[in-house]
């Protein structure tokens, strides 16, 4: 996928008519070969820039949902893809859908046609569509896949929105502190110093801090810059990402949010693949391919290894230490009763509802702590600012 380039061409068809079009090709040479196969004599070729934002998961899920609707209405797969290509507002999506329709006309299975486009359609898409092809229920598999992707996206957006709240509050508090340190407090201190009396210890300490931060601000900026570079370099190391994720999961409330989001994703995809008839190991592989966090990828790899060595599913989950006793009990019951897909779906619903509720209540849960922290900092600065005024009467009477 990364090597493919999008080209706009203008040429003459075999019957002598002028025609325009767009094609994906890995090079100009391969583009010319593809046009030759279509009996097109190119007159001009232009490479088109690719907008990576168009490959977001919500775009892919929307296309799959629309395709499922067309299949349900009785259109063939190639007809549905061709119709979607005509109606899609994005040029690169039009070219992609036309390419898939062309592959189908050449006798290539839809699931195999998606293989070169794993950046757009992850392995989960390919596995579900392959299952739909084998069972003759492609429309149902596409509907279920689109529903799962939409629900997962809504949960992810909800968690991100909830986590932004404390960050915004703390950022505003820092801005207020900086403004008071560098603009307000020095003015009060200058007025008080005209009386030639020493500043109160609290005010003097904060003024010293303000002077230091002003004098050595370049050093603080340099330190922040170096810290950002170090973090960027560390983010490329899987070992650091694993340690970082473990630490984040230990943070109260926020850790529960992040864990709930990941467990919802895991159980939702496993329930989806199980109900479609895909083996559990293949389902775990589909989950692993959708994960971007090395820590959870490591856990899923461990689960795959344990199950491959003959351990029951519930025990493989238990060995990771990230699944609650409720998860283990329901999975164990599902294994024993043959209703694993139902139990996985129940777990997905359970974690989704709990995580959504926690995200909705995050502001109320964090508000007391945030108020104490920000109120304590700003309150200390206000006291330091007005302490000299409280002592002003003593200073003036001393002068008298």
UniProtKB/Swiss-Prot annotation:
InterPro entries: GspF/PilC, T2SS_GspF/T4SS_PilC_CS, T2SS_GspF_dom, T2SS_GspF_sf. PROSITE patterns: T2SP_F. Signal peptide: none annotated. The chain crosses the membrane at residues 165-185, 209-229, 370-390. Pfam families: T2SSF. Belongs to the GSP F family. GO terms for cellular component: plasma membrane. This is Protein transport protein HofC homolog. The lineage of its organism: Bacteria, Pseudomonadati, Pseudomonadota, Gammaproteobacteria, Enterobacterales. It comes from Escherichia coli (strain K12). It is found in: Cell inner membrane. It is a multi-pass membrane protein. It comes from the Bacteria. Keywords: Cell inner membrane, Cell membrane, Membrane, Transmembrane, Transmembrane helix, Transport. One of its GO terms (biological process) is protein secretion by the type II secretion system.
């Amino acid at each position: 996928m990364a090597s493919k380039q999008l080209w706009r061409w203008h040429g003459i068809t075999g019957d002598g008519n002028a025609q325009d079009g767009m094609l994906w090709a890995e090079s100009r040479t391969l583009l010319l070969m593809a046009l030759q196969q279509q009996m097109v004599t190119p007159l001009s070729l232009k490479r088109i820039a690719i907008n990576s934002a168009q490959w977001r998961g919500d775009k892919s899920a929307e296309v799959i949902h629309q395709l499922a609707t067309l299949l349900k209405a009785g259109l063939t797969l190639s007809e549905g893809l061709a119709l979607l290509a005509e109606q899609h507002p994005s040029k690169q999506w039009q070219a992609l859908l036309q390419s898939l329709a062309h592959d189908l006309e050449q006798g290539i299975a839809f699931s195999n046609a998606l293989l070169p486009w794993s950046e757009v359609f992850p392995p989960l898409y390919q596995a579900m569509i392959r299952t739909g092809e084998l069972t003759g229920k492609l429309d149902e598999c596409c509907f279920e896949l689109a529903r799962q992707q939409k629900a997962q996206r809504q949960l992810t957006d909800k968690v991100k929105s909830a986590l932004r709240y404390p960050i915004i509050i703390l950022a505003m508090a820092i801005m207020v502190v900086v403004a008071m340190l560098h603009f307000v407090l020095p003015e009060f201190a200058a007025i008080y110093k005209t009386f030639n009396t020493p500043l109160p210890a609290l005010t003097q300490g904060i003024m010293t801090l303000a002077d230091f931060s002003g004098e050595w601000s370049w050093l603080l900026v340099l330190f922040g810059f170096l810290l950002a570079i170090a973090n960027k370099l560390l983010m490329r190391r899987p070992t650091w990402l694993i340690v970082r994720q473990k630490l984040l999961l230990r943070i109260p409330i926020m850790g529960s949010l992040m864990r709930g989001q990941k467990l919802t994703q895991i159980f939702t995809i496993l329930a989806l693949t199980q109900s479609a008839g895909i083996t559990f190991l293949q389902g775990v592989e589909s989950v692993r391919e959708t994960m971007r966090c090395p820590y959870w990828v490591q856990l899923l790899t461990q689960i795959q290894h344990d199950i491959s060595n003959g351990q029951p599913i519930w025990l493989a989950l238990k060995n990771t230490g990230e699944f609650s006793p409720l998860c283990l009990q329901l999975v164990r019951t599902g294994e024993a009763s043959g209703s694993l897909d139902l139990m996985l779906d129940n777990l997905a619903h359970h974690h989704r509802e709990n995580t959504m509720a926690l995200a909705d209540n995050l502001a109320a849960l964090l508000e007391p702590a945030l108020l104490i922290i920000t109120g304590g900092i700003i309150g200390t600065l206000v006291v330091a600012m007005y302490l000299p005024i409280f002592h002003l009467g003593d200073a003036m009477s001393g002068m008298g």
